[in-house]
Amino acid sequence: MNNPLYQKNIISISDLSRAELELILTTAQSLKHNPQPELLKNKVIASCFFEASTRTRLSFATAVQRLGGTVIGFDNAGNTSLAQKGETLADSVKIIASYADAFFIRHPQEGAARLAAEFTNIPVINGGDGSNQHPTQTLLDLFTIYETQNRLDNLNIAFVGDLKYGRTVHSLAQALSLFNCNFYFIAPEALAMPDYILEELNEKGINYSVHSSIEEVVDSLDVLYMTRVQKERFDETEYQHIKSAFLLNADMLENVRENLKVLHPLPRVDEININVDKTPYAYYFQQAQNGIYARQALLALLLTNHFQDQA
């Protein structure tokens, strides 16, 4: 059976169908339980981070190396010809891509990954472009939800915090809309979910509602997806008010569903009290670890045409 993801660019989560998402998740599950240490032997993956990253960069490098591949690239664009000598992004991409079998890019500019894809004939993977998209984070989020809930369909999912600039919630809401989930958006008015996401949900007939506090909906949830409210976007007084309104404490989880899982793309700052860590609902550290398997699955499918026959 031909692999529909072979040599495909992954720029937006919207580039993937429900069937393709399910293929990635089953492949991730297979790789988590059945490692393939030589699957990417002799493959070279370019990893280019024009923006700071910890979890994405390290889990991606780990994913490649545990599949037997080699990583080239940089985590500080300030030391590259693009920054030091004025080379264009297009020229940088063309040259780096000529050394590799796939190109993973994180960039602060929205649309940078799609631009990169125009200048190379190898698969380009978007590792985050500005406040736009973060599709590989979405894949690990979906894998974690599937792993903990045993399904993706018809779940009650709340998104909390910075829903305007948080690229992780944009991608995840779009992906989960393929599975007819119910959404609860909890954010300060200045950081509400963008209109274009709401319009997409309306077009698909997806149920969603807007709330001012976690307590309003937490007892009805299957997944509580927390995000960081960015302090730099508010004055100190306003930030302190917002921070306290969107803080999750363990005592707020006393009457929740047994299957509830609290997720967070990390890093967390003030939005999840450490007393939540010891509850059975906290799953954000396992979620981060799942990034290895989700990214392994994506690489396996992009670079090996018949891997799904083994999954």
UniProtKB/Swiss-Prot annotation:
Subunit structure as annotated in this protein's UniProt entry: Heterododecamer (2C3:3R2) of six catalytic PyrB chains organized as two trimers (C3), and six regulatory PyrI chains organized as three dimers (R2).
Keywords assigned by UniProt, alphabetized: Pyrimidine biosynthesis, Transferase
Sequence positions that bind carbamoyl phosphate: R55, T56, R106, H134, Q137, L266, P267
Residues making up the signal peptide according to the UniProt record: none
Domain of life (superkingdom): Bacteria
UniProt keyword Membrane present: no
Encoding gene (name): pyrB
Reactions this protein catalyses: carbamoyl phosphate + L-aspartate = N-carbamoyl-L-aspartate + phosphate + H(+)
PANTHER family hit by this protein: ASPARTATE CARBAMOYLTRANSFERASE, ORNITHINE CARBAMOYLTRANSFERASE, MITOCHONDRIAL
One of the record's GO molecular function terms: aspartate carbamoyltransferase activity
Pfam family, one: OTCace_N
Pathway(s) the chain acts in: Pyrimidine metabolism; UMP biosynthesis via de novo pathway; (S)-dihydroorotate from bicarbonate: step 2/3
Xref: HAMAP family: Asp_carb_tr
Residues reported to bind L-aspartate: K85, R167, R228
EC numbers, comma separated: 2.1.3.2
Function text: Catalyzes the condensation of carbamoyl phosphate and aspartate to form carbamoyl aspartate and inorganic phosphate, the committed step in the de novo pyrimidine nucleotide biosynthesis pathway.
Protein family per UniProt: Belongs to the aspartate/ornithine carbamoyltransferase superfamily. ATCase family.
Disulfide bonding pattern of the chain: none
Protein name, UniProt field: Aspartate carbamoyltransferase catalytic subunit
Organism: Psychromonas ingrahamii (strain DSM 17664 / CCUG 51855 / 37)
Lineage: Bacteria, Pseudomonadati, Pseudomonadota, Gammaproteobacteria, Alteromonadales
